[in-house]
């Protein structure tokens, strides 16, 4: 049984907004301000508007769609479009990610441990 979940750069199209008004489990979100694949105003921001009980665990304003992929796929195996969608935007530093990982772990400890 799933007792808590964390979504990174969630896609709003996957959800009926009304179904997020009262989720049956704690939901945490990691959002990226420069996601060109799932534009925040149509996706993560929409999920946050619909899901007031959701917890924004971390927001990376300069992060792109692949912020939680570690390591990133090698550029040599990506096509041009995939590279544009998955590459880190200029100004994004992956040095922030260990803190994001700690926040995710803390969210799960809070909701899963007795």
Describe each model-derived feature in a short phrase.
Residues 14-18, 29, 112-114:
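Conserved, well-structured beta-alpha core segment at the onset of a catalytic domain
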Residues 22-25, 29-94:
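Active-site-adjacent alpha-helix of alpha/beta-hydrolase-fold enzymes
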Residues 5, 57, 108:
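Divalent metal-coordination and catalytic microenvironments
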